[in-house]
């Protein structure tokens, strides 16, 4: 079973990602991870941290000479600002007198509405929001992206699967409603300042961000991930936790600030009649074909051979420059929420993180289905399965009967 976890704090020495269960033989380099982390820093409306934040990547284990070894893979992402935070975020005890002289160590007692501050302070018994926000910060997603890079490499090399994303809308911008992008479109999408797949949608998104900047506010939005090349049959209908859509939804909802997920046409499907809600099946020369993909590539919890489409709704960033009303947890008095350096909009980057979680879930499902200790073995199993599926396709079966 493919498993992953991360460790570390936003201003700590480093973040660490550990991925266990990956097969041996997958080509992977530090530059592969660096390229994905640079994509995570993309986007119009990002804060000052993105301008100087450099992800110092170190492969700690599980990879040798650019190839995975089959054991747990550990990846470290160093914090270039660590010297500024070394005392405040030290793991070992520090003299209170020394801490008292450091301004950035001042207790944060005014929780931000919409953030983990309030519930985290009460749940864990903290009198300072610092321990909460350090781990709850979206900076943690850098470690996930590192782990997801391994999953992406496996999916591409074992099955020929490609994962792309684009921004549908930001704030109240006019949503993109055209055809989904193809893998070849990813470079053009990343070249867009808001990772849009349409020039008109891009202009509308930028206008929204500019307005929010002027007003001292923040914005959320909607992103879509499209996955091509998936075979029929990943996931299962046999139980709820084996359904691929439940796994995808859980993984995407686990991303900071994500408040909603839909597969395919999702909530729009609920407003349609059944006669126009589903993807009708027709005979084709090499099996069945469909003229629509409203289901988004999943039926009954399983991939159906069409592109997978997953959308995620990101709420506006909770660190709002104009400061929201809150209560000081020490005094109980009315206050304004703490404000630290933050983005106006991080939706373009969220698309990359959603790609990551989708890739991890799909890699896990593929390894459950096809197994193997090495990439070569997994490929052999994939090819055998694809031949068996092709033989069961109506057109293929009919030809076999006719020739027999």
Swiss-Prot record:
Keywords linked to the UniProt accession: Amino-acid biosynthesis, Aromatic amino acid biosynthesis, FAD, Flavoprotein, FMN, Lyase, NADP
Positions that bind NADP(+): 40, 46
GO cellular component, one term: cytosol
Residues that coordinate or bind FMN: 135-137, 256-257, 300, 315-319, 341
Needed cofactors: FMNH2
GO molecular function, one term: FMN binding
Domain of life: Bacteria
InterPro entries: Chorismate_synth, Chorismate_synth_AroC_sf, Chorismate_synthase_CS
Enzyme Commission numbers on file: 4.2.3.5
Matching PANTHER family: CHORISMATE SYNTHASE
Family: Belongs to the chorismate synthase family.
Function: This reaction introduces a second double bond into the aromatic ring system.
Name under which the protein is recorded: Chorismate synthase
Organism, scientific name: Mycobacterium sp. (strain KMS)
């Amino acid at each position: 079973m493919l498993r992953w976890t991360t460790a570390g704090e936003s201003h700590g020495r480093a973040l660490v990602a550990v991925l266990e269960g990956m097969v041996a033989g997958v080509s992977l380099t530090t530059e592969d991870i660096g390229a994905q982390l640079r994509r995570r820093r993309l986007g119009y409306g990002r804060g000052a941290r993105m301008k100087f934040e450099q992800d110092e990547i170190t492969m700690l284990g599980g990879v040798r000479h650019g190839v995975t070894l089959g054991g747990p893979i550990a990846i470290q992402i160093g914090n270039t600002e660590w010297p500024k935070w070394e005392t405040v975020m030290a793991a070992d005890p520090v003299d209170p007198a020394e801490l008292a002289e450091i301004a950035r160590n001042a207790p944060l007692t005014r929780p931000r509405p919409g953030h983990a501050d309030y519930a985290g302070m009460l749940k864990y018994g903290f009198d300072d929001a610092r321990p909460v926000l350090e781990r709850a910060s979206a900076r943690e997603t850098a470690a996930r992206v590192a782990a997801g890079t391994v999953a992406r490499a496996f999916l591409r090399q074992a099955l020929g699967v490609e994962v792309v994303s684009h921004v549908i809308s930001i704030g109240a911008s006019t949503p993109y409603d055209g055809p989904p992008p193809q893998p070849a479109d990813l470079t053009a999408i990343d070249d867009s300042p808001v990772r849009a797949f349409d020039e008109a949608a891009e202009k509308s998104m930028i206008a929204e961000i500019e307005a929010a900047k002027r007003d001292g506010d923040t914005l959320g939005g909607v992103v879509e991930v499209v996955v091509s090349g998936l075979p029929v049959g990943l996931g299962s209908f046999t139980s709820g936790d084996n359904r691929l859509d439940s796994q995808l939804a859980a993984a995407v909802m686990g991303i900071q600030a994500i408040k909603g997920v839909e597969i395919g046409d999702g909530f729009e499907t609920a407003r349609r009649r059944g006669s126009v809600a589903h993807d009708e099946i027709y005979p084709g020369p090499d099996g069945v074909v469909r003229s629509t993909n409203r289901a988004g590539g999943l039926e009954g919890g399983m991939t159906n051979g069409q592109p997978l489409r997953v959308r995620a709704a990101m709420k506006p960033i909770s660190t709002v420059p104009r400061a929201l009303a809150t209560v000081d947890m020490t005094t109980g008095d009315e206050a304004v929420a703490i404000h630290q350096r933050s983005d106006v909009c991080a939706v373009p980057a969220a698309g990359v993180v959603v790609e990551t979680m989708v890739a991890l879930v799909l890699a896990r499902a593929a390894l459950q289905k096809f197994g193997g200790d090495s990439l070569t073995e997994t490929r052999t199993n994939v090819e055998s399965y694809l031949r068996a599926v092709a033989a069961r396709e109506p057109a293929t079966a009919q030809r076999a009967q006719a020739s027999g």
